[in-house]
Amino acid sequence: MAGIKVFGHPASTATRRVLIALHEKNLDFEFVHIELKDGEHKKEPFIFRNPFGKVPAFEDGDFKLFESRAITQYIAHFYSDKGNQLVSLGSKDIAGIAMGIEIESHEFDPVGSKLVWEQVLKPLYGMTTDKTVVEEEEAKLAKVLDVYEHRLGESKYLASDKFTLVDLHTIPVIQYLLGTPTKKLFDERPHVSAWVADITSRPSAKKVL
């Protein structure tokens, strides 16, 4: 077996999502740096691993995957006997985790990623942050966080009282937003604030910074 390989960029939120899952499972892996600024993700040999030209790509021996949330689910299930449990096998828990992943991927991440782009990445590229876009996206994020605040008033984490993939998937975007004025949206909601402090302090999360 060739072992686990992750092809990605350390600053990519999608790549970090996979790395956090691997660290939660205490798994050894090889990280292959794909330089985004040089367009390596749009060329061979990376395109062979992900025809859509997005990081990360993943290999576990002969098994190949792309799309970060598919990769984390594979890691959580295939290595269920390793490290920390990130999923549950109960029917209702499975459904709850699936719902949480859908909400994160369709409601939280698109908005959060736009805010990261405007406030973190654009300045790095010498571009100007569009304050109007930031205001619009913060209003959208506030609505998502209101849903999270209600949910976290009922359980310690988003899917249950245990840390799962639902929580893990939010960490990379949150890590970036904590260094921006958008942090106020987390701080204004007590349950969300406590949850953010909890999940971002996990050893696995600290290892990707």
From Swiss-Prot:
Q: Which reaction does it catalyse?
A: RX + glutathione = an S-substituted glutathione + a halide anion + H(+)
GO BP terms in the entry: defense response to fungus; response to cadmium ion; toxin catabolic process
Induction: what does the entry report? By ethylene, salicylic acid, copper and the bacterial pathogen P.syringae.
Q: Where in the cell is it found?
A: Cytoplasm, Cytosol
GO molecular-function terms, A-Z: cobalt ion binding; copper ion binding; glutathione binding; glutathione transferase activity
Give the EC number.
2.5.1.18
Function summary: May be involved in the conjugation of reduced glutathione to a wide number of exogenous and endogenous hydrophobic electrophiles and have a detoxification role against certain herbicides.
What's this protein's name? Glutathione S-transferase F7
Species classification: Eukaryota, Viridiplantae, Streptophyta, Embryophyta, Tracheophyta
Query: Which gene underlies this protein?
Result: GSTF7
